[in-house]
Amino acid sequence: METLNSYLKIIHFPNGLLVDNIKNYRENYAKFKSKNYSPILKLKIDKTKDNIELRDEVINDFISHISDLINLKSNYVGGIRYILSELFDNIFEHSESEFAFLTFQNYPNLKKIEICISDIGIGILGSYKKTNSSLEKNFSDIITDLDALKSATEGKSTKSVERGFGIHTSRNIISEGFKGYILYQSGNALAINDSIFESNSYIRGVIFVMNIPYDNIDNQFSIYDFLE
């Protein structure tokens, strides 16, 4: 128990390591560069130019940390960067959360890496309801968390301008391209790759967990095969 508590403290569980400026962030993050995990990074959701640039710097450093640990090939780096950028764009645009959270854990013996992104906002259902009330689109048929998660997985976008497919495309990249799995939950709706069902637990906002194996990297993988 003492070891677990020590680990949780090191990764800044449960509150996260606040990313407030690039200098402080890099000083705090430097001690993790040789570790098989990152701290729980806590990014302020603020759509100002400076904060977006800070977010993008953090994502680049985060991916570099993973790549350096497991010698990740450039085609996989591109895929992970696309997924993180797309999910963070969605969180910043729709979640109404004050913060977003990002962390990873490498499992060298299993040759797998897990990446987790979450927020504590209005959730996927709340995002559809907000868009429906604005009369930009009609999502009146989306009533439950399960309805919302199914719609998001199918690529039913809340964006005024269709740009990518968010969860839909990310899921396909991970499950078909990386041969891994993605678990995501919003409210009491839970999805693991193609399976979507009601969960006994309820979470505020959204959580995404990506499990990516790297023991048999597909050199032919290209993110462009999954973009429409």
Indicate where each model-derived feature is located:
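STAS-like cytosolic regulatory interaction modules
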Residues: 1-65
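Conserved ATP-binding N-box helix of the HATPase_c
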Residues: 11, 74-109, 167-176
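A short mid-domain helix/strand-loop element embedded in enzyme catalytic domains
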Residues: 51-85, 109-126
